[in-house]
Amino acid sequence: MSFRFNEAVFGDNSFNERVREKLSTALNSPSKKKLDILKSGIKVQKVDFPTIPQLEILDLDIITQPKSLAKGICKISCKDAMLRIQTVIESNLLLINEQDTPSFTMPQLINNGSFTIPITMTFSSIELEAITNIFVKNPGIGISFNDVDLDFKFDCSVKILQSTIERRLKESMHVVFKDVLPSLIFNTSQNWFTNRGESTSTIPGKREHHHQQTTMSRNVILDGSDFQELSPINMLRLSSIVSSRSTLSLHSTVMNSLSAIPGCLERQNLYRFISRMPSLNNYYSSQSFPQPKSSTVSSKQLVKPFYCSHNLLPKTVLDSSQYDLATITKIQSRLFDRSNSNDDNAKPRRRKIKCKKTRTPSNLQSQGEQAVDDSTAIETVTSTPVQTPIPELEEQSPPYLKTTVSIRDKYVIPEKISLNLDSKKDTSKKKPFYFIGLNSQEPSNNWKWGMEDSPPPYH
């Protein structure tokens, strides 16, 4: 889908004059930061569009948008345009940052005056091709440039500065398409729609135009018909944000609320709510107890807090023993019911203490003596050193044996320990045992000289 401009509008010089004045107002806007190098305002001398621009509509969204809004994506092409700008610059670079520079860093020169140079910049053969997003509403048209391809020829009256200015202009050209041109097109469209039936020959001055931009009526910002275009989901989110200023929502205090909003508790009334909470400290702090007589009183005792968040008995109550177990049980039960209101199966964990009969002093003394005796008995057993030599019993050998060879291990098993072992006598499975060597002098005792099959190993 394509779009054609009216050739008669571009053929008339009035269009170029309007663009020139609008561009001069945008470049000299007071909202922009004025460069110190510029000694005067920027004046647009000439604007010319010999070739009619081309506009191609790539996408148009009208159905999904409200009736007062239209969105589209367009491609703009412009060729052979010309722009001439004139201004005055400061050539003495020492005076540019004179206000922000300390005096002791400035050199004392013989002639340190201002030296201004008038400069004229001409942009010719401008070729522009850009993809834009267009938003059309009743007051005007808004355009944002996304993809811009720009080429031009630059000519400066001061040739020594031409290369530097051209490089800086190309680097900062994105500011022109991001801020200057969109504001220029929007202001022009506003003036065009408001004065559609009237002549546009009279153009307001600089101050009047700036006042027209800054002063806006309240109906333009938010009209009554705009509420129908707002999404109900967004309205619900906005209402939740507004209601979030009241925090700490307590559903259990809807009837007896401490604030104007039912079900909510404001932070400035939080101490009042805590003071009404059932606790041991809040209950006993309301009663008056005699203060201890002491010469030195600390600052913490002089200043008594209005409430306490801990469920503890005050020290004065414990010292004076003016507490009641039934009252403490009632308060603790109320706290438990309040904390477990949603859980019916929860049971309180109570600490049970069994009280027995008091012991007589004689029983205590006898038990103490018995404990002492037990401790001494234990000490006598444990105090035996480990390295104490244990006397070994002599072996009871027959009197007719003179030379014996012991085959027992060097570790002697005590009789007490050996009795605990499960030693069952089984004579049928016992293997024959033989002594090796000369063990007897009398052959009548049936002692053998060794193994029957092999002689003893004599060396």
From Swiss-Prot:
Lineage, opening ranks: Eukaryota, Fungi, Dikarya, Ascomycota, Saccharomycotina
Subcellular location: Mitochondrion outer membrane
InterPro entries noted in UniProt: Mdm34, SMP_LBD
Protein name in UniProt: Mitochondrial distribution and morphology protein 34
Domain SMP-LTD: 1-190
Family: Belongs to the MDM34 family.
Region of interest (Disordered), residue spans: 338-375
Biological source species: Saccharomyces cerevisiae (strain AWRI1631) (Baker's yeast)
Post-translational modification: Ubiquitinated by a SCF (SKP1-CUL1-F-box protein) E3 ubiquitin-protein ligase complex containing the F-box protein MDM30. Ubiquitination is important for mitochondrial integrity.
Gene Ontology terms, MF aspect: lipid binding
